[in-house]
Design a protein with these regions (language model features):
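Conserved C-terminal alpha-helix-loop-beta "cap" of PLP-dependent enzymes
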Residues: 1-177
Length: 178
């Protein structure tokens, strides 16, 4: 790969390709697998246009945004890097952010805000967003431009990440009483 502008764009392109493949795996396969266990996975941005995927997890039947936020924080706690626990190094890492009502709750011309559709799919009302004031959103970044090239290989990082994420989500959901 050239060490000039053309090489830089190849790195960016491969990173975005990797995140789009991860998006498809999560949106098409993982969300269906989790649904059979009564777990909802909502992936944002169809398809991703940068090297970032944001997603939210909820348990079927849970209509409390506060409880859903707790669930997503617990999932992040399992897959985050903690420098205080140097011996606990997750194979993959995710992070968490908050979408606040002040930023994402403003109504558009159609009377809806940018989170309405996502929350509806997850079983959470828009009123909950207004009263709680924030939604905890999980995210992961593909920083390896060769992730897409590992597809079908050993290891296939997209498959391994999806398997790790699924096991973590199922374990956390089973340990929390929602």
């Amino acid at each position: 790969m050239p060490l000039d502008r053309s090489g830089y764009w190849q790195l960016i392109g491969k990173s975005i390709q990797g995140v789009q493949e991860l998006y498809l795996k999560c949106e098409k396969d993982l969300s269906l697998e989790l649904a059979s266990s009564g777990i909802k996975l909502r992936v944002f941005t169809d398809p991703p246009d940068i090297n970032l995927i944001c997603f939210i997890v909820n348990k079927d039947g849970n209509s409390s945004l506060s409880r859903m936020n707790e669930l997503n924080k617990a999932i992040c706690d399992e897959l985050k890097f903690d420098p205080a626990e140097i011996t606990k190094r997750p194979e993959f890492m995710i992070s968490i952010t908050e979408f606040t009502y002040d930023q994402y709750g403003l109504e558009g011309f159609d009377g809806k805000n940018s989170m309405d559709e996502h929350l509806q799919v997850l079983g959470i009302s828009s009123r909950e967003f207004g009263s709680v004031g924030r939604v905890s959103v999980l995210r992961c970044t593909i920083i390896n431009p060769w992730c897409a090239l590992s597809r079908g290989g050993k290891p296939d990082y997209v498959e391994v990440f999806a398997t790790t994420l699924k096991a973590t989500i199922e374990r956390v959901v089973s340990n929390l009483s929602l």
